[in-house]
Amino acid sequence: MFKNTFQSGFLSILYSIGSKPLQIWDKKVRNGHIKRITDNDIQSLVLEIEGTNVSTTYITCPADPKKTLGIKLPFLVMIIKNLKKYFTFEVQVLDDKNVRRRFRASNYQSTTRVKPFICTMPMRLDDGWNQIQFNLSDFTRRAYGTNYIETLRVQIHANCRIRRVYFSDRLYSEDELPAEFKLYLPVQNKAKQ
């Protein structure tokens, strides 16, 4: 999808405030919902994915199962709200051995397991909003001893709220981020009595 796009800096694949946040995504819902709601903490529109079973409610990008993202930027960043329920996401990458590998992170696992085509790992989320930064190049090298070439697919499962999902060429400090990539928490004005 993005193979022939010049890639540097930031490449966003989901923004909850956009007119069609799931334009390039496919949705699967069983015993749950995927809807846009206003989050009270940030007073802004977010995408909520909830389901009784994490494996049957998710969004996947690209929507067409025969297509791939072709994103070469090595950092995946997701701004996600912890709903204090089971949550998992999966990224499929291509390495320099031309092998498709999957990384699955979840908040209900306690150990990392590396198998030839999938690496599952635990993820700890703080209360409220989290910025998940995933160094795909580093994970590919550490898990498989190969070099990351590109990301083919991203799949985000229940249960979470999403503000934005993007790729970047490196990790950026809060000061370096463009305004629309930051998560603004409303300032609490407490007048002194």
Curated annotation (Swiss-Prot):
GO cellular component labels: axonemal B tubule inner sheath; axonemal microtubule; centriole; ciliary basal body; cilium; motile cilium; nucleoplasm; sperm flagellum
Location(s), subcellular: Nucleus; Cytoplasm, Cytoskeleton, Microtubule organizing center, Centrosome, Centriole; Cytoplasm, Cytoskeleton, Cilium basal body; Cytoplasm, Cytoskeleton, Cilium axoneme
InterPro entries, A to Z: CFA20/CFAP20DC, CFA20_dom
The keyword Cytoplasm is annotated on this UniProt entry: yes
Keywords, ordered alphabetically: Cell projection, Cilium, Cytoplasm, Cytoskeleton, Flagellum, Microtubule, Nucleus
Tissue expression summary: Expressed in trachea multiciliated cells.
Highest taxon listed in the record's lineage: Eukaryota
BP terms from Gene Ontology: cilium assembly; flagellated sperm motility; positive regulation of cell motility; positive regulation of feeding behavior; protein polyglutamylation; regulation of cilium beat frequency involved in ciliary motility
Pfam families linked to this entry: CFA20_dom
Subunit structure: Microtubule inner protein component of sperm flagellar doublet microtubules.
Purpose of the protein: Cilium- and flagellum-specific protein that plays a role in axonemal structure organization and motility. Microtubule inner protein (MIP) part of the dynein-decorated doublet microtubules (DMTs) in cilia axoneme, which is required for motile cilia beating. Involved in the regulation of the size and morphology of cilia. Required for axonemal microtubules polyglutamylation.
Protein family according to the UniProt entry: Belongs to the CFAP20 family.
Xref: PANTHER family: ORF PROTEIN (PTHR12458)
Record-given protein name: Cilia- and flagella-associated protein 20
Species for this entry: Bos taurus
